[in-house]
Amino acid sequence: GRLAQAAQEISDGTAANLLVRRLGGPAGVTARFREMGDSVTRLDRYEPDLGLVLSADLRDTTTPAAMAQLVRRITTGELLQRDSRDRLLGWMRNTRTGVHRLRAGLPEDWLTGNKTGTGRAEGTTNKCNDIVITVPPGRSPIVIAAYYDSGEYTPQVERRHEAVLAEVARIVTDWVAG
């Protein structure tokens, strides 16, 4: 449990690598995705190499739609027992990464958890991704996945890149408010 919690809450790459090894390596994780009904997402490398994302490279890829569908199925009880699902949702709500991404554009009274993804390496463009499960008061859960390619390389994730994802969440908020 502690490895999964660290991988989720603070994006601990070492913890994630240990979990991936326990699941049979990247191929084992990809096989699990297939078992869960995700025919798109694939894992091919360990951290930190999977953060090196080249435009035409299919390794370590997914789509926002595939990830949103998978997260919806995991977090709404279709794939996990209730206690495991509740534990994961708690970790997602306690996640310390991504506070300036999708979460920043959602109302504070919406119960929200997230998981970020970031790709950056010299010679590539920064990728700034986030997925949230959020519950507006009195409403059903909503899953939002947004992936942003900044078109540039910077040594750190820039707040202006994260702001694009916050704007996506504001648009969803306006849509939900109707």
Task: Outline where the language-model segments fall.
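Mid-domain, small-residue-enriched loop/turn segments at the edges of structured enzyme/sensor domains
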Residues: 1, 20-77
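Structured C-terminal helix/loop/strand segments within mature extracytoplasmic catalytic/sensor domains
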Residues: 69-96, 121-178
